[in-house]
C-alpha cells in the first residue's frame, strides 16, 4: 500500500522514525510531519497563513520525507492533496504518550488521522505510554502492534471514514496480555495556574493533574490492565441518542 505517515511530535521524533522504518518493510511510504513539536494542537489548520514545506532526509530511511511549518492536520492535507498521489492509508504516530479517553479531543495525533478520514482515506492513530523523565524510549513494540493491525486491516477492514485509534502500554512486550477493541473512557484534568509575572498582561504557567476515570470496557481500564487498546473513531460528533428528544423540544 501507499502509506502517508505523520504525527504531532515533529519530524525529528523517535516515534515517527520507528514507525516509518517498520512500515517501509512492506509498503511504500511518504513522511509529512510538523517541523516542530505540535502536541495538543487538536484539529487546528492554518487559515490565511502561508505554509512552508521543506524536503527532509531521515537517517536510515530511503523514502520521501517533508517537514511542514503548520499543524498535524495541515500535514495530512498536504500529504494527500499536494505531495503524494494515491494514498491508501494514513498512519499518525507513534505518539509519545497515550491518546486515550477524552484526551483524543486535544490530540494532534488523532486529529491528523481524522483528517485522513475526512478525505475518505482509511486512517490509524498509534500512541504509546512513556516514562516522561526519559527521552530514549524504544517504540518498537508499538510499531510491531500497528504492523499487525495494518496486516489484518488490509485483508479485512479498511474503511474510508473510520479511524482506528491504537494505544500501547509501557510494559515489556511479553507482558502485554493482548488487544481489546473498546470504547473510549472519560478523563478530565484539574488545571492549576501559577502566576509568573504581572505587567500589562498577567503571565501564567499551567499544569494539569489528570482525574482519570477508569470504567470497565473502556480504553483507560484495559490499558491499566496491560492490554493494547483499539477504538474505532468517527468525525461525526452527533449525539444520536438525544437527537429525537431535541427535535421534539426545539423544532
From Swiss-Prot:
Tell me the lineage of the source organism. Bacteria, Bacillati, Bacillota, Clostridia, Eubacteriales
Where found in the cell? Cytoplasm
Entry protein name: 5'-nucleotidase SurE
SUPFAM superfamilies the UniProt entry points to: SurE-like (SSF64167)
* Positions of disulphide bridges: none
Q: Which GO terms describe its molecular function?
A: 3'-nucleotidase activity; 5'-nucleotidase activity; exopolyphosphatase activity; metal ion binding; nucleotide binding
| GO CC entries | cytoplasm
Describe cofactor binding as the record notes it: Binds 1 divalent metal cation per subunit.
Give the family from UniProt. Belongs to the SurE nucleotidase family.
Reactions this protein catalyses: a ribonucleoside 5'-phosphate + H2O = a ribonucleoside + phosphate
- State the Gene3D superfamilies in the record: Survival protein SurE-like phosphatase/nucleotidase (3.40.1210.10)
Amino acid at each position: 500500500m501507499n502509506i502517508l505517515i505523520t504525527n504531532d511530535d515533529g519530524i525529528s521524533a523517535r516515534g515517527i522514525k520507528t514507525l516509518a522504518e517498520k512500515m517501509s518493510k512492506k509498503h511504500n511510504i511518504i513522511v509529512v510531519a510538523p517541523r516542530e513539536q505540535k502536541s495538543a494542537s487538536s484539529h487546528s489548520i492554518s487559515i490565511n497563513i502561508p505554509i512552508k514545506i521543506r524536503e527532509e532526509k531521515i537517517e536510515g530511511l530511503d523514502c520521501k520525507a517533508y517537514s511542514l511549518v503548520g499543524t498535524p492536520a495541515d500535514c495530512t492535507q498536504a500529504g494527500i492533496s499536494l505531495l503524494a498521489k494515491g494514498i491508501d492509508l494514513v498512519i499518525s504516530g507513534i505518539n509519545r504518550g497515550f491518546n486515550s479517553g477524552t484526551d483524543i479531543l486535544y490530540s494532534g495525533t488523532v486529529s491528523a488521522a481524522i483528517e485522513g478520514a475526512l478525505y475518505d482515506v482509511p486512517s490509524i492513530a498509534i500512541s504509546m505510554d512513556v516514562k516522561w523523565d526519559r527521552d530514549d524510549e524504544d517504540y518498537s513494540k508499538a510499531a510491531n502492534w500497528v504492523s499487525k493491525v495494518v496486516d489484518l486491516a488490509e485483508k479485512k477492514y479498511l474503511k474510508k471514514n473510520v479511524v482506528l485509534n491504537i494505544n500501547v502500554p509501557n510494559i515489556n512486550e511479553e507482558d502485554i496480555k493482548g488487544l481489546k477493541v473498546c470504547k473510549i473512557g472519560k478523563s478530565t484534568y484539574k488545571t492549576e495556574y501559577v502566576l509568573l509575572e504581572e505587567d500589562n498582561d498577567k503571565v501564567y504557567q499551567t499544569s494539569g493533574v489528570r482525574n482519570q476515570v477508569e470504567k470497565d470496557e473502556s480504553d483507560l481500564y484495559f490499558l491499566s490492565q496491560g492490554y493494547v487498546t483499539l477504538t474505532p473513531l468517527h468525525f461525526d460528533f452527533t449525539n444520536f441518542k438525544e437527537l429525537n428528544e431535541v427535535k421534539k423540544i426545539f423544532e
